[in-house]
Amino acid sequence: MFGLKQFYQNEVRTKLAQELDIKNPMLLPKLEKIVISVGAGAYAKDMKIMQNIAQTISLIAGQKAVITKAKKSVAGFKIREGMAVGAKVTLRNKRMYNFLEKLIVISLPRVKDFRGISRNGFDGHGNYTFGINEQLIFPEVVYDDIMVSHGMNITMVTSTDNDKEAFKLLELLGLPFAKVR
């Protein structure tokens, strides 16, 4: 792998400064963290499946996953306060760039009928979120080891509050956005 962090520092920053007309290099947008999360849904009651989901995310991210718990009880969903409802991993620095590079170069091309990720995942504050339907696109996941097939949400948090600047940053980093029709 070619080192996405070096690519960002050597090439992306200069292109961003030119295209966004930013003179101060400290004001250039940068990727701060990537959060990978899974909601267990109907499998929340089964702790073995929850452990398997957390283990799968840990394999994908290269860092131990945290099991998330419900903040309050919701009778309609049969959830009690403190009950395990999902798992998440927050990646920063070297692991963040390694994961992003693996996602762009290896995993997303393995998605069937892939035409790019949606441009509609920006939240208005410079953060981008998209979902993946199956965890099997990652090379670390072995089909025989998973108990249940699940997707995941991937959130990329940037240092800018502007969606246009965040889009330009992610596009220059190599995220394959879908073409506008």
UniProtKB/Swiss-Prot annotation:
UniProt xrefs under Gene3D superfamilies: 3.30.1440.10
Annotated InterPro entries: Ribosomal_uL5, Ribosomal_uL5_bac-type, Ribosomal_uL5_C, Ribosomal_uL5_CS, Ribosomal_uL5_dom_sf, Ribosomal_uL5_N
Keyword flag RNA-binding: yes
Any one annotated GO CC term: ribonucleoprotein complex
Transmembrane segment boundaries: none
Keywords assigned: Ribonucleoprotein, Ribosomal protein, RNA-binding, rRNA-binding, tRNA-binding
GO-annotated biological processes: translation
Single GO MF descriptor: tRNA binding
Keyword Thylakoid: no
Subunit record text: Part of the 50S ribosomal subunit; part of the 5S rRNA/L5/L18/L25 subcomplex. Contacts the 5S rRNA and the P site tRNA. Forms a bridge to the 30S subunit in the 70S ribosome.
NCBIfam families: PRK00010.1
Entry's family note: Belongs to the universal ribosomal protein uL5 family.
Function as written in the Swiss-Prot or TrEMBL entry: This is one of the proteins that bind and probably mediate the attachment of the 5S RNA into the large ribosomal subunit, where it forms part of the central protuberance. In the 70S ribosome it contacts protein S13 of the 30S subunit (bridge B1b), connecting the 2 subunits; this bridge is implicated in subunit movement. Contacts the P site tRNA; the 5S rRNA and some of its associated proteins might help stabilize positioning of ribosome-bound tRNAs.
Cited PANTHER family: 60S RIBOSOMAL PROTEIN L11-RELATED (PTHR11994)
Protein's recorded name: Large ribosomal subunit protein uL5
Organism of provenance: Helicobacter pylori (strain P12)
Organism lineage: Bacteria, Pseudomonadati, Campylobacterota, Epsilonproteobacteria, Campylobacterales
GN (gene name): rplE
